[in-house]
Curated annotation (Swiss-Prot):
Keyword terms, alphabetized: DNA-directed RNA polymerase, Magnesium, Metal-binding, Nucleotidyltransferase, Transcription, Transferase, Zinc
Function: DNA-dependent RNA polymerase catalyzes the transcription of DNA into RNA using the four ribonucleoside triphosphates as substrates.
EC number: 2.7.7.6
GO cellular component: DNA-directed RNA polymerase complex
UniProt source species: Limosilactobacillus fermentum (strain NBRC 3956 / LMG 18251)
Gene3D superfamilies given in the database record: 1.10.132.30, 1.10.150.390, 1.10.1790.20, 1.10.40.90, 2.40.40.20, 2.40.50.100, RNA polymerase II, clamp domain, RNA polymerase Rpb1, domain 3
UniProt-listed GO biological process terms: DNA-templated transcription
Lineage: Bacteria, Bacillati, Bacillota, Bacilli, Lactobacillales
Binding site for Zn(2+) 2: 818, 892, 899, 902
InterPro entries in the record: DNA-dir_RpoC_beta_prime (IPR045867), DNA-dir_RpoC_beta_prime_bact (IPR012754), RNA_pol_asu (IPR000722), RNA_pol_N (IPR006592), RNA_pol_Rpb1_1 (IPR007080), RNA_pol_Rpb1_3 (IPR007066), RNA_pol_Rpb1_3_sf (IPR042102), RNA_pol_Rpb1_4 (IPR007083)
Protein name: DNA-directed RNA polymerase subunit beta'
Family per record: Belongs to the RNA polymerase beta' chain family.
Catalytic activity of the protein: RNA(n) + a ribonucleoside 5'-triphosphate = RNA(n+1) + diphosphate
Subunit structure: The RNAP catalytic core consists of 2 alpha, 1 beta, 1 beta' and 1 omega subunit. When a sigma factor is associated with the core the holoenzyme is formed, which can initiate transcription.
Binding annotation for Mg(2+): 449, 451, 453
Length: 1215
């Protein structure tokens, strides 16, 4: 076997007949498979042991030689080589065809490759190949033309007239001869000459032909190889035949297809020997051609060959295609050993880096480790005895199991794996039962809940795999989401309500105004019932020796609540005391207003002091983010566990319950509804009198009922008791929101009909009163629509993610600094007056390209090439800076990736990104993962004329990344100048906008409903939209430059996500857009070898020009193109990646003719061939590291190494 990790690249080409014969171990001449009585393979048949190898390990067919000692011996009696039966998976055979057959991929594909080489149309080719017409091979002196088609009667006439002065033939044989006659170099030269004059259709055809001819010239493939004299036969174990119970056989479809080819081939041979009449031979040749076509790609031409039950047979092409094909099913998605799956259950008592593993699963997963340990400890004499012990569940085994799983991390995965946090590592803890236990805080990352979800578990085997799982994948490390750098692990549900209840303050609770010397004294008073958690008390500030209070504050008494004292007790010792849920408290410590001078009357203070709001879910997240920033991973994960334990404990003790009595009645509801009814009656009256249109009436009625619902909601909030458990639940962010409460206690309001239009009939009841039958029926429409939408959205979003990953999978951080001198000037993204993305979010975690100066004073805030952290970014914003030039993926010069500087900070760790990080995949997942939260529908903008439905949500994202013509397209100005006139033309229902540029004047005609964005006298830049709507990026890239198009697309994507409240970092979107813009189309090839109209990577284009300029030639010119992600993924330099994505046969056909070489740069192609991926520790720099013993010093840092870089630093120090 070849070692996959040792080769550089992989090449594909056309197989010559000699090559096919060299692969083969013998010719298959009989259609037989296996003998039905003996079940042994037939001689010379499709399963022959002489050709393909023995069916039993080291045993020949007749049984003369058995055992491995006869290895490689060929039996004299039966001719079978004695070797491992595995060879039946790799040995091929061949079939010598009695007449050549064309390969359907090259004849039928679009464009037809044979047609382009011969300059014949696919229709003409089909007539020749399938024996409908003759083609002239040699015209002699007859005045016919070469390649001219002749019908059967016409051929006979000419034959009588000219005899043997010309030759014409039919079938693939004729095409093979024509292909062999083509002088590639001569044709290519002629075409190049044609290209200089030709235009239009003729030019396009010439370019395509030249492209194919050049491909044959460069690759060394010969055109005649597109017609086959011999076809390979696949190894038998890859097209098996198995016996079912009842004596029937199940067989792979390929065997049927091969059998048809062999049968027809043998019949043709016999007919040729018998000198049968031409028409019979011709018919048999045509049938052989059709059999070969069906074998290669059944159904591509004519009706597919069907098997039993009229099911089309699966041919060789079908084995590769689609989700169930070889690429996606077996090469990209293998099933692995040492894995299992089970239902998950909650494990609230575990630490963040642990999971509960059921004993029976652990026994099976760690079996080899247990066996090894049992024999090592001499508890079992050999492997067999050890296995027996495990099967009998011997109690010694359990002790060994405990030791084996200690310190051995396992990986847990939940499908669908939408982002990289869908697989995390944990340390297993043995638990009883059959369900795996999952830590409650990692549920958010997995999107898991415990209503029957299942998860898969995998055991990393090698030491390196275990080390990576522990250092890089441990769940405790994954605190920030790679999408936006915010914490993804946050307390939820019970934990939130527990901490909320605990940090609530109440007036006049028992023991109010007591003053304690420290937290412990307060805890004792609480345990003994002198105070409640919600009691406001004083405590000596000086008792907190490590908390960062000011010297002044340390002399005073701080007013807080007992619950808050206990809450702060679980925080890191030197972390700020948290007394109110504000960012100010986190950044600058407890405000001075909470401190009393010793001797001041605390009761008087409490009389007037307002109650401080409790800590809600969002604030707990802020605390976690802040702690992470200061203390990094270890401390944060420990804190998270403490918050979790405290939350569960306190929510249990609080005794919060929900009953029907907690849903209060609203006294004002009847009069609000009465008022609304009157307004509706008034509007209807106006409509009947013809004062308003039906549309206006509808809009107003909807408006009236929405206002009524809002009023009910506001009244409910006013009357809401802060101790109401339902209110506490929604206010804390544990579950539900105010609209749920409105539906329980107020009114349900308006519902959507099945068409999505809002019905005028409101649901006046709430769930507390109960709905009438009609109301119930109406509201069921909306519920059903919600369910179907979600299902559709999931599929759409999943497919989007797949395309995004495919186009960006080869983008990896390749180097430290690409040395670019270009940057991206960023400002806040706004839409009208609405802030979409503030400048702070756009510059945080990025490198500056130029120094940033204070616009008022002119002083330098930060220099160039500086990574902006929170503090610096805030400084820039505070100084009133509007524009900052940053390093960006758009302007990065690194090939096949991005450099560390242009990428900036890794959102998932909060540190500078490291070389080897697979940022392309992370970017794709970050954009795709929230896809299910985006809406599927277009928003109907309340009937405002002209502003037709703006595409939003998922459809808009697809429109952008596939660079389709947008719905509601805006017209853009092609000149820079001034708007001189805007004229309406009512007769033709249009508006004409005239813009006077520096050189010419343009007039744009828009529909009369269009909302114009400019006014007369306005200055306008080229590429700016004249009316409301989305700009077509293809037009923009034509009129403006690449960078402004990229910037526009970035702001459009952000617009969609931020409108839905989803934060997404710019850098992810930048990477995707850069992948769409990486190609240029050659306009004029100059003196280079490239072809006009060819798509090239920018780097390839630059290299071609560089060589030409050095030798003093004229360089080529090209213009940038924008490709949709599907097209971009198919245009990648890796044919393996493209073929495994979509249109497998087309990609492979093209790659074979061009003799493409796959450099194995991306992740996908390396996974396909089983090579370690060139990202992370698989990068060249990290390979071939020799292990070295190091003394472990325990008193070092907090012990947790969080990145490879830290590991390297430590090793350096020890050297």
């Amino acid at each position: 076997m070849i070692d996959v990790n040792n080769f550089e690249s992989m090449e594909i080409g056309l197989a010559s007949p000699m090559k096919i014969r060299s692969w083969s171990y013998g010719e298959v001449t009989k259609p037989e498979t296996i003998n039905y009585r003996t079940l042994k393979p037939e001689k010379d048949g499709l399963f022959d042991e002489r050709i393909f190898g023995p069916t039993k390990d080291f045993e020949c067919a007749c049984g003369r030689y058995k055992r491995a000692r006869y290895n490689k011996r060929v039996c004299e009696r039966c001719g079978v080589e004695v070797t491992s039966a595995k060879v039946r998976r790799e040995r091929m055979g061949h079939i010598e065809l009695a007449a050549p057959a064309s390969h359907i991929w090259y004849f039928k594909g679009i464009p037809s490759r044979m047609g382009l080489v011969l300059d014949m149309s696919p229709r003409e080719l089909e007539e020749v190949i399938y024996f409908a017409s003759y083609v002239v091979l040699d015209a002699g002196d007859t005045g016919l033309e070469k390649k001219q088609l002749l019908s059967e009667p016409r051929y006979r006439e000419l034959k009588e007239e000219y005899g043997n002065r010309f030759t014409a033939e039919m079938g693939a044989e004729a095409i093979q001869k024509l292909l062999a006659d083509v002088d590639l170099a001569k044709e290519a030269t002629e075409l190049k000459a044609v290209l200089k004059e030709a235009t239009g259709q003729k030019r396009t055809r010439a370019v395509r032909r030249l492209d194919i001819l050049e491909a044959f010239l460069k690759s060394g493939n010969k055109p005649e190889w597109m017609v086959m004299d011999v076809i390979p036969v696949m190894p038998p174990d890859l097209r098996p035949m198995v016996q079912l119970e009842g004596g029937r056989f199940a067989t792979s479809d390929l065997n049927d297809l091969y059998r048809r080819v062999i049968n027809r081939n043998n019949r043709l041979k016999r007919l040729l020997e018998l000198n049968a009449p031409g028409i019979i031979v011709q018919n048999e040749k045509r049938m052989l051609q059709e059999a070969v076509d069906a074998l290669i790609d059944n159904g591509r031409r004519g009706r597919p060959v069907a098997g039993p039950g009229n099911r089309p047979l699966k041919s060789l092409s079908h084995l590769l295609k689609g989700k169930q094909g070889r690429f996606r099913q077996n090469l990209l998605g293998k099933r692995v050993d040492y894995s299992g799956r089970s239902v998950i259950d909650v494990g609230p008592s575990m630490k963040m880096n642990q999971m509960g593993l059921p004993v029976p699963m652990a026994m099976e997963l760690f079996k080899p480790f247990i066996i090894h340990e049992l024999t090592k400890r001499n508890l079992a004499t050999n492997v067999k005895a050890a296995k027996r012990m495990i099967d009998k569940r011997d109690e010694k085994v359990f002790d060994v199991l405990e030791d084996v799983i200690k310190e051995h991390p396992v990986l847990l995965n939940r499908a669908p794996t939408l982002h990289r946090l869908g697989i995390q590592a944990f340390e297993p803890i043995l638990v009883s039962g059959k369900a795996m236990r999952l830590h409650p805080l990692v549920c958010a990352a997995y999107n898991a809940d415990f209503d029957g979800d299942q998860m898969a578990i995998h055991v990393p085997l090698s030491d390196e795999a275990q080390a990576e799982a522990r250092l890089l994948m441990l769940a405790a490390h994954h605190i920030l989401s790679p999408r936006d750098g915010e914490p993804i692990v946050a307390p939820s549900q019970d934990m939130v309500i527990g901490n909320y209840y605990m940090t609530t303050e109440d007036k006049a609770r028992e023991g109010e105004g007591m003053i304690f010397k420290d937290t412990n004294e307060a805890r004792m008073a609480y345990r003994n019932g002198y105070v409640a958690l919600q009691t406001r008390v004083g405590v000596l500030t000086s008792s907190f020796d490590k908390k960062p209070f000011t010297a002044e504050q340390r002399q005073k008494i701080m007013v807080t609540s007992v619950g808050k004292l206990l809450f702060n007790n679980i925080m890191p010792e030197d972390y700020t005391y948290i007394n109110e849920p504000t960012a100010d408290n986190l950044q600058n410590g407890v405000p001075d207003k909470y401190f009393l001078e010793p001797g001041e009357d605390i009761h008087a203070y409490l009389e007037n002091a307002p109650l401080v709001p409790p800590f809600k879910k969002g604030f707990l997240s802020d605390i976690i983010a802040d702690v992470y920033k200061i203390y990094k991973v270890t401390v944060t994960s420990q804190l998270l566990d403490r918050i979790k334990d405290l939350g569960y404990y306190e929510s249990t003790i609080s005794g919060l319950t929900v009953g029907i009595a907690d849903v209060t009645d609203l006294k004002e509801k009847p009069e609000i509804i009465e008022k609304a009814h009157k307004q509706v009656a008034l509007v209807t009256k106006q409509f009947r009198r013809g004062l308003i249109t039906d549309n206006e009436r509808y809009e107003r009625v909807i408006g009236i009922w929405n206002d009524a619902k809002d009023e009910v909601q506001n009244k409910l909030i006013e009357h809401m008791d802060i101790h109401n458990p339902i209110n506490m639940m929604s206010d804390s962010g544990a579950r539900g929101n105010i609209s749920n409460f409105t539906q329980l206690a107020g009114m349900r309001g308006l519902m959507a009909s099945p068409s999505g239009k809002i019905m005028e009939l409101p649901i006046l009841s709430n769930f507390r009163e109960g709905l009438s039958v009609l109301e119930m029926f109406i509201s069921s429409h909306g519920a059903r629509k919600g369910m179907t939408d979600t299902a559709l959205k999931t599929a759409n979003s999943g497919y989007l993610t797949r395309r995004l990953v495919d186009v960006a999978q080869d983008v990896i951080v390749r180097e430290k600094d690409c040395g670019t001198d270009r940057g991206l000037e960023v400002t806040a993204i706004t839409n009208g007056n609405e802030m979409i993305e503030p400048l702070y979010d756009r510059i945080l975690g990025r490198y500056t390209m130029k120094s940033v100066f204070n616009p008022e004073t002119g002083e330098k805030i930060v220099g160039k090439n500086v990574l902006l952290n929170e503090e610096m970014a805030q400084k820039i914003i505070d100084a009133g800076v509007q524009k900052v030039t940053i390093r960006s993926a758009f302007t990065c010069n690194t090939e096949h990736g991005v450099c560390e500087r242009c990428y900036g900070r890794n959102a998932a760790t909060g540190d500078q990104v490291e070389a080897g990080e697979a940022i392309g995949t992370v970017a794709a997942q970050s954009i795709g993962e929230p896809g299910t939260q985006l809406t599927l529908r277009n928003f109907h903008t309340g009937g405002v004329a002209g502003n037709d439905d703006i595409t939003q949500g998922l459809p808009r994202i697809q429109e952008i990344v596939e660079s389709r013509n947008p719905k509601g397209k805006a017209t853009i100005s092609e000149v820079t100048g001034q708007v001189v006139s805007i004229e309406e033309n009512p007769a033709e229902q249009t508006k004409d906008v005239t813009i006077k540029g520096e050189t010419d004047t343009r007039t744009y005609t828009l529909p009369i409903t269009a909302r114009i964005r400019v006014a007369e006298g306005d200055d306008i830049h080229r590429g700016r939209a004249i009316n409301e709507g989305s700009i077509d990026p293809k037009e923009m890239i034509r009129v403006r430059d690449v960078l402004s198009t990229e910037t526009y697309l970035l702001s459009e994507v952000q617009n969609v996500y931020r409108m839905q409240g989803i934060d997404l970092l710019d850098k992810h979107v930048e990477i995707m857009i850069r992948q769409m813009m990486r190609k240029v189309r050659v306009m004029d090839p100059g003196d280079t070898d490239v072809l006009p109209g060819e798509l090239l990577d920018i780097s390839q284009f630059r290299d071609a020009n560089y060589q030409t300029l050095i030798s003093g030639g004229i360089p080529a010119t090209a213009r940038p193109v924008i490709l949709g992600i599907t097209k971009a993924a198919l245009e990648t330099n890796s044919f393996l990646s493209a073929a495994s994505f979509q249109e497998t046969t087309r990609v492979l056909t093209d790659a074979a003719i061009r003799g493409k070489n796959d450099p194995l740069v991306g992740l996908k192609e390396n996974v396909i061939i089983g090579k370690i991926i060139p990202a992370g520790t698989g990068m060249g720099a990290y390979r071939n590291i020799k292990p070295k013993e190091v003394s472990v010093n325990t008193g070092a840092t907090d012990g947790a190494i969080t990145s490879i870089r830290e590991m390297e630093e430590q090793l350096k120090d020890q050297d």
